[in-house]
């Protein structure tokens, strides 16, 4: 979990575009965040398994 200060800092607009980075909206993780969902890979997987993301299902081939 990210600190509350880091989450608050991320919500503010960055002074420069290179300073901006994505964080998971659910847990605050800074790495491997899917921009379309604003979730990290771990949270995305958990929610997909629970069926809480519409249109997403487990792939099988």
From Swiss-Prot:
Coiled coil: none annotated. It comes from Levilactobacillus brevis (strain ATCC 367 / BCRC 12310 / CIP 105137 / JCM 1170 / LMG 11437 / NCIMB 947 / NCTC 947). The keyword Cell membrane does not apply. Disulfide bonds: none annotated. Part of the 30S ribosomal subunit. Contacts proteins S3 and S10. NCBIfam families: PRK08061.1. This is Small ribosomal subunit protein uS14B. One of its GO terms (cellular component) is small ribosomal subunit. Gene3D superfamilies: 30s Ribosomal Protein S14, Chain N. The keyword RNA-binding applies. GO terms for molecular function: rRNA binding; structural constituent of ribosome; zinc ion binding. Zn(2+) binds at residues 24, 27, 40, 43. One of its GO terms (biological process) is translation. Its cofactor is Zn(2+). It comes from the Bacteria. Belongs to the universal ribosomal protein uS14 family. Zinc-binding uS14 subfamily. Binds 16S rRNA, required for the assembly of 30S particles and may also be responsible for determining the conformation of the 16S rRNA at the A site. Binds 1 zinc ion per subunit. Keywords: Metal-binding, Ribonucleoprotein, Ribosomal protein, RNA-binding, rRNA-binding, Zinc. The lineage of its organism: Bacteria, Bacillati, Bacillota, Bacilli, Lactobacillales.
